[in-house]
């Protein structure tokens, strides 16, 4: 738990000091590698509300800076059952006024490019997003679903 708290604290420090970015990626990346005693992915016992006091300032800062939040489909690939960040965090992002998202897949191999993008799109629509963003010359361009 302390490692997770430190992870979020450092992330907020980072985006407070360095603002020359377009998309904040890997918001809850640390959960991809947390396992329970049986070796199961940690995402199943990660509750947004448990870390809301650390996550909300990050989301608010992303919105304040008019940056995008990456939704990464690798969570599906690694058995978490959800993308990163998880749906509760994405709901909160919307509630706080966040609209800009990008979609990534950690496609370090050709077969992982755009991994489960259709599944992710369905989830994002269900949550209330109507599209995602790409960047061209660092300028955001909205792509509607």
Which sequence ranges carry the predicted segments?
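C-terminal regulatory/interaction regions
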Residues: 118, 125-135, 139-145
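Structural preference for beta-strand elements that scaffold enzyme active sites
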Residues: 22-24, 66-70, 100-102, 131
């Amino acid at each position: 738990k302390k490692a997770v708290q430190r992870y979020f604290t450092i992330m907020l420090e980072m985006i407070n000091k360095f603002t020359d970015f377009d998309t904040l990626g890997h918001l809850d990346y640390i959960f991809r590698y947390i396992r329970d005693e049986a070796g199961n992915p940690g995402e199943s016992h990660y509750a947004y509300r448990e870390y809301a006091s650390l996550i909300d300032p990050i989301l608010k800062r992303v919105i304040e800076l008019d940056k995008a939040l990456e939704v990464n489909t690798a969570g599906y690939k690694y058995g978490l059952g959800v993308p990163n960040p998880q749906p509760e965090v994405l709901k909160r992002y919307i509630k706080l006024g966040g609209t800009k998202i990008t979609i990534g897949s950690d496609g370090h191999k050709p077969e992982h490019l755009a991994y489960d993008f259709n599944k992710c799109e369905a989830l994002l629509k269900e949550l209330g997003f109507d599209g995602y963003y790409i960047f061209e010359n660092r300028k955001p361009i909205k792509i509607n679903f």
